[in-house]
């Protein structure tokens, strides 16, 4: 938007008015951790948090030091590859929120050398970013512990793959909600550049209204997405992944 504003002298995506961007659905960034691993971490650290995960990442004694089994090896963190999935960046921002104890995180916070050193220790528990796929929740379902012990992923991805995880592996995946939550709101925005007519803009608005309609918002529940329409609760349908 900034580059177009510089060239055209106006915004092409609006933040207010009839054509402003609006969320279509919402998915929170949550912890997904195998139950056996989560129980060991909670027994040792009392909670699942970025601080706990950092301490687990730097534990030189591996899982025995964390209250787990020696056969588990070292703690393995799972976050999406930031080069393939914006969720990887969201995870790092969420970690920064907890590190600083606030929600207003700026560039200067992320580039702070002390935070960078802490983050490097934390991300050292990721087995291999270069081979990490964009859809790590699906990898949990397919490959189990070889992917990792747990990590922060989109709630919708975890819910969509939960049945596969329960079917293939004896150890269920538990979902935990962090103190500092980041989320994706999947915005629908109307392009208001000079090449779009009023008829085209209004057609886009009509499609937006269709997506926010009760029936479509209820359909989103079967994909583990939270409705943006406040009149549709997460347990509105039998097919909702929030009630399965």
Model-derived regions, located:
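Periplasmic-binding protein-like
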Residues: 17-31, 116-126, 130-133, 167-196, ...
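Ligand-binding pocket segment of bilobal, Venus flytrap-like solute-binding proteins
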Residues: 91-176
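N-terminal segment of the mature folded domain
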Residues: 1-73, 81-84
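Stable alpha-helical elements in mature extracytoplasmic
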Residues: 1-4, 27, 49-53, 87-91, ...
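Sec-exported extracytoplasmic/periplasmic mature domains
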Residues: 5-9, 33-37, 58, 95-104, ...
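Extracellular/periplasmic juxtamembrane helices and adjacent flexible linkers that interface
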Residues: 189-244
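Short helix-loop capping/hinge motifs at secondary-structure junctions, enriched
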Residues: 36-43, 84, 97-106, 194-204
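Structural recognition of the beta-strand scaffold that forms the well-ordered cores
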Residues: 1, 30-33, 75-79, 87, ...
């Amino acid at each position: 938007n900034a580059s177009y504003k510089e060239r055209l002298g106006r915004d092409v995506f609006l933040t207010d008015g009839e054509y402003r961007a609006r969320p279509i659905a919402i998915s929170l960034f949550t912890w997904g951790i195998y139950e056996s691993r989560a129980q060991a971490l909670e027994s040792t650290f009392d909670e699942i948090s970025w601080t706990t995960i950092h301490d687990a990442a730097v534990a030189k004694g591996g899982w025995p030091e964390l209250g787990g089994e020696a056969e588990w090896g070292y703690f393995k963190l799972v976050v999406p590859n930031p080069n393939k999935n914006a969720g990887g960046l969201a995870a790092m921002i969420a970690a920064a929120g907890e590190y600083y104890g606030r929600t207003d995180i700026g560039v200067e916070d992320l580039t702070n050398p002390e935070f960078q050193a802490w983050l490097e220790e934390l991300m050292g528990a990721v087995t291999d970013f270069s081979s990490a796929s964009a859809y790590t929740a699906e990898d949990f379902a397919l490959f189990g512990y070889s992917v990792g012990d747990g990590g922060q992923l989109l709630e919708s991805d975890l819910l969509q793959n939960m049945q596969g995880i329960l079917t293939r592996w004896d150890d269920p995946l538990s979902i935990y909600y962090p103190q500092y939550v980041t989320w994706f709101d999947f915005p629908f925005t109307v392009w208001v550049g000079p090449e779009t007519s009023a008829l085209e803009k209004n057609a886009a608005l009509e499609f937006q209204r269709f997506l926010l309609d009760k029936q479509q918002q209820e359909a989103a529940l079967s994909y583990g997405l939270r409705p943006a329409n406040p009149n549709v609760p997460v347990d509105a349908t039998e097919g909702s992944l929030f009630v399965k």
